[in-house]
Amino acid sequence: MSIKLIAVDIDGTLVNSQKEITPEVFSAIQDAKQAGVKVVIATGRPIAGVAKLLDDLQLRDEGDYVVTFNGALVQETATGHEIISESLTYEDYLDMEFLSRKLGVHMHAITKDGIYTANRNIGKYTVHESTLVNMPIFYRTPEEMADKEIVKCMFIDEPEILDAAIEKIPAEFYERYSINKSAPFYLELLKKNVDKGSAITHLAEKLGLTTDETMAIGDEENDRAMLEVVGNPVVMENGNPELKKIAKYITKTNDESGVAHAIRTWVL
């Protein structure tokens, strides 16, 4: 069975350590498109953080799709039409904000148009996220967030501080939300059952594809859900060792154009 859809993570996967798309990766993706394969970027970033990549990779044609916010938003790239759009409630936000203060970690909330923090001492990783995804930062008190459509919240801090906080997150939080670590300094909290896997499953069904016709390429824990639902899970050589245990294939590192290697070896 030939592969007809490839879901590709960005950071640590699609781009190299300099956050660049190598010529080899660009070429492989264009060849896959020419062969009729759907290449879908699937990322924890908001849409603003992938816009330039979609342009650079020429993934804005009719019938092209993008998965952002770790699966909370799925859109047609040519029109912006939303196929899936999930968000947290204001009560969810308040509970997360309260827990972050109790655990002593920075938190920010992300909408489709900005990053919001209730901490006047804005964390350096919030600034990093703002730069990475090309979104502005706004200071708002929790009371001023009631009218915002919050797609996800993130606990962000130094890895050792964040890891210590994760150990203290109540079990009921894992029952209420989708929680996954996307980087050593990022913990993402979304609506329950929202992840890259649910988004890719929905998209594959919409396109009439079988599991065997799908591939996902990733490197970190927030890629686990999509790697588990496709027939051909590929993990980067630089990926999380735990993630490699569920891989069908291990490709080269992101600095060795691993996405291109995967496409040319197992797809084309």
Regions found by a protein language model. Give the residues of each.
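Short, structured coil segments at secondary-structure junctions
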Residues: 62, 70, 173-175, 229-230, ...
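Active-site phosphate-binding/coordination module
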Residues: 23-123
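Short active-site oxyanion
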Residues: 36-40, 64, 152, 212-213, ...
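Mg2+-dependent phosphoryl-transfer enzymes with acidic/Ser/Thr/Gly-rich catalytic loops
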Residues: 1-5, 22, 188-268
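Hydrophobic packing residues within well-ordered alpha-helices of enzyme cores
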Residues: 25, 50-54, 165, 169, ...
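Asp-based phosphoryl-transfer active-site loop
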Residues: 4-18
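Conserved acidic, metal-coordinating active-site core of Asp-based
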Residues: 99, 103-217, 238
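A generic "binding-loop/recognition-motif" signal
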Residues: 46, 70, 112-113, 185, ...
